[in-house]
Amino acid sequence: MGFLFSINRKLKMPRDGNEGMFTIPGFSQIQFEGFCRFIDQGLMEEFHKFPKIEDTDQEIEFQLFVERYQLVEPLIKERDAVYESLTYSSELYVPAGLIWKTGRDMQEQTIFIGNIPLMNSLGTFIVNGIYRIVINQILQSPGIYYRSELDHNGISVYTSTIISDWGGRSELEIDRKSRIWARVSRKQKISILVLSSAMGSNLREILDNVCYPEIFLSFLNDREKKKIGSKENAILEFYQQFACVGGDPVFSESLCKELQKKFFQQRCELGRIGRRNMNRRLNLDIPQSNTFLLPRDVLAAADHLIGMKFGMGTLDDMNHLKNKRIRSVADLLQDQFGLALVRLENAVRGTICGAIRHKLILTPQNLVSSTSLTTTYESFFGLHPLSQVLDRTNPLTQIVHGRKLSYLGPGGLTGRTASFRIRDIHPSHYGRICPIDTSEGINVGLIGSLAIHARIGHWGSIESPFYEVYQRSKETKMVFLSPSRDEYYTVATGNSLALNRGGIQEEQIVPARYRQEFLTIAWEQIHLRSIFPFQYFSIGASLIPFIEHNDANRALMSSNMQRQAVPLSRSEKCIVGTGLERQAALDSGVSAIAECEGKIIHTDTHKIVLSGHGDTISIPLVMYQRSNKNTCMHQNPQVRRGKCIKKGQILADGAATVGGELALGKNVLVAYMPWEGYNFEDAVLISERLVYEDIYTSFHIRKYEIQTHVTSQGPERITHEIPHLEAHLLRNLDRNGIVALGSWVETGDILVGKLTPQTANESSYAPEDRLLRAILGIQVSTAKETCLKLPIGGRGRVIDVRWIQKKGGSSYNPETIRVYISQKREIKVGDKVAGRHGNKGIISKILSRQDMPYLQDGTPVDMVFNPLGVPSRMNVGQIFECSLGLAGDLLDRHYRIAPFDERYEQEASRKLVFSELYEASKQTANPWVFEPEYPGKSRIFDGRTGDPFEQPVLIGKSYILKLIHQVDDKIHGRSSGHYALVTQQPLRGRAKQGGQRVGEMEVWALEGFGVAHILQEMLTYKSDHIRARQEVLGTTIIGGTIPTPEDAPESFRLLVRELRSLALELNHFLVSEKNFQINRKEA
């Protein structure tokens, strides 16, 4: 076996001095371990299932020698795969043999099976040039589960559910007469004796293998004896109940095959994990290799159910993590590989039969096609719900995406059927799944995130590390605890790090977790303790300082909004952080890291050349690369020529990183006060300094592409000679018809000139064309202009043009031209900004700096937030961050604060902030920084009048992010445009140049104001009255009064037609005043 992929990376960070070092796993390590497990174990497991294939006459045999398979190093690099829209994959070769049994000859060849996409250094895949990631899925673990429900009489009914590896379910239930039934469908149930007999047991074996044989004998009447008299009778009875067929079916081989396929294969295959769970729950010793449900399992389950009926045993909590399993990238890729081998087997069988029929020469090479494996993986990465396009908005988004856990997907739940209990936080999530980080909306609680120290174990369970507590000893030992072992230990949850120098807990009573309950017990009864304050949070939640002072809902919003932050043109480290910023930036892979020590011999914007150990290494840098959210990924060199560096040192900072630390936003001076209503309801007032000094300026790169095809009339042409177009639209095209690099383009400009040939008949020519043809004999062009034009809102600078030409040039392999345009966006009214505590808002006004409120030293404030957004939202952490940020800015310090610091001392956060403010006040000789009458607040002045405000105002430095929800992407207007064909009303949506909907409530509002003419215009001229809107356009150009529409609009006509389809005729009439005659008007 050849394997050319290995990643095993861990980072060390210091912990307490008395316990040396501990290891924080790489944030992408779960993806790496899963893929390595697939390559090392999954491939061989599926290969061993591949059978020897024989022809119908059993003269020829085909087999694979799977022990000698080879994975070849990829032929292209990651960058080239993205650039050329290819898949970063490895070719799989396997020796295969073709044996002629008559002559005992064998022909062996190494054949190409197909391509397997490889995981790159970011833990992602590159498929057709697009970064994709496979997220982990949480499923109900196969095994047996016991529960009780109340029937309509209020009596408890006990049932056991057997879940197979395929997700199929079978139930055993016990009724009031202590009879045990197996429910094979929603309506049908059969006796446990019939099920056991159909699985191969006779009555004597059944009675010998149960603990309560008298209960089984109690409902054994003559009819039941006849049903289980033989295995055939039991199978017939079982089939009759399962398939719901009437009459008397006859036992046959096809009947057994159908039952095997529809029931036993889907509901009785437990798998490796199911067999382990079944043995543990029922105290069995069946070998792990026996993965099918046996009669012994069913009888043991029935015994346990009887014990439940009489009060023995415990019920199962279906939402406990010990009853869940993680379906990782290894399992998903292995399933697809097995599916591809099944398709390959069918293809080989068909090829052998066809070749023998047509008397063709057979070789292993021409029997096997690579399409089975390649197309299986392409469809998996393109269509499977758990294979998603990697979100690359910023570095944090990339690493968080790979650590998601989803209850959704094949075999899982759906957002509309999942109950509240499944979505809720469970005590077993502690240290494994973050209780905060989840999606908002319909999928809340169904998509979670792994805690930072959690790992996925061999059996698909989530494990979390803890330290064993040894009384009166310094010795520590770290253990990874699976959810099934939680019940046996008492875990300290509070003061896990508050140890004295001897390693002994100073406090006697500590909060702890035992058997899914949170208690307060003596330290002597503690078995395990946490290893890190962030242990139970995800990465996003771990980056929120003072998170313990925030409401959980706001912390959830913050962890989601940090993933929406746009990388800024000039990033800045946060003054107040948590200490995980460096780890997050490092694991995201956006920074360039030195792989060995050496000396820098050359550096520029394109590459860094490093000399070390006698070799010269060239490290290419990312230059203005577009992410799939149109943000700009760029690397800036941080080392100079001649500098000696060490292994692991930062060579170049990436997008949203500074000095190797994550830097998503900016430290700006904020004030919490109302200002003329401009910060009403979460609106934000900002200073013009943020615009003019490019504080919140970001670059966005958009991609526009066009393809050339070979049509039935001939090939399409790329050219700069486009007839009937104005010259200024073509001014940026080069001689090839493609926009020149560095050009500034505006809306409507031609980016790529393209002509499509079309059929030419005499009637299609314009009169002047026919005249030119008749007089001068000039051949008029019959090509149609199909140029790539810059859409609305796309103005910017052309930074890259790519012309991808694939071999063949047919319509199936079209040429693709991509144009990349960079936009510089300053912050403006309508953009969304947010802090790290769920405090979000929209820019409402940009005020000149002289009008902004200013401090006592004359510094104008940068942002003004509404103070009413704090008490009701209960996110007080922003107040601590704001005040401590001010102290850090004045003292030139950066703070990295672990959460839950109240574990050491009461009011620890408040004391820290006030002490730093007091020190800043003393060192800078500014008494207004800390005023004892109102600590943290200060008297500030109105910039318009120079007068102080009535009340002291909270001011400070907060870390504020600019989010990707920007007004340039959302603002939209329409005068006229496209209309729907059926209703003749304007289309909906910005992409279709649609209009704004005037719905039922909008009509009520207009009616309430009595604006009859505006209401009539909304429902006629501006909507679906075809003739009236045409007349409006004419009278607007010519002048004059707009005529009043007399007939009905198109939507009313549509209603009439729909009523006619229901055989209802609707007409309206006019009654004459003179003779009261009815004049009929057709609708």
From Swiss-Prot:
A Pfam cross-reference name: RNA_pol_Rpb2_7
EC numbers: 2.7.7.6
Principal subcellular localization: plastid
InterPro entries linked to this entry: DNA-dir_RNA_pol_bsu_ext_1_sf, DNA-dir_RNA_pol_su2, DNA-dir_RNAP_su2_dom, DNA-dir_RNAP_su2_hyb_sf, RNA_pol_bsu_bac, RNA_pol_bsu_CS, RNA_pol_bsu_protrusion, RNA_pol_Rpb2_2
GO cellular component, one term: DNA-directed RNA polymerase complex
Any GO MF annotation of the entry: DNA-directed RNA polymerase activity
Reaction equation(s) it catalyzes: RNA(n) + a ribonucleoside 5'-triphosphate = RNA(n+1) + diphosphate
Entry keywords, A to Z: Chloroplast, DNA-directed RNA polymerase, Nucleotidyltransferase, Plastid, Transcription, Transferase
Gene Ontology biological process: DNA-templated transcription
Places the protein is found: Plastid, Chloroplast
Task of the protein: DNA-dependent RNA polymerase catalyzes the transcription of DNA into RNA using the four ribonucleoside triphosphates as substrates.
Recorded family membership: Belongs to the RNA polymerase beta chain family.
PANTHER family xref list: DNA-DIRECTED RNA POLYMERASE I SUBUNIT 2
HAMAP family hit by this protein: RNApol_bact_RpoB (MF_01321)
Subunit structure: In plastids the minimal PEP RNA polymerase catalytic core is composed of four subunits: alpha, beta, beta', and beta''. When a (nuclear-encoded) sigma factor is associated with the core the holoenzyme is formed, which can initiate transcription.
Name used for this protein in its record: DNA-directed RNA polymerase subunit beta
Encoding gene (name): rpoB
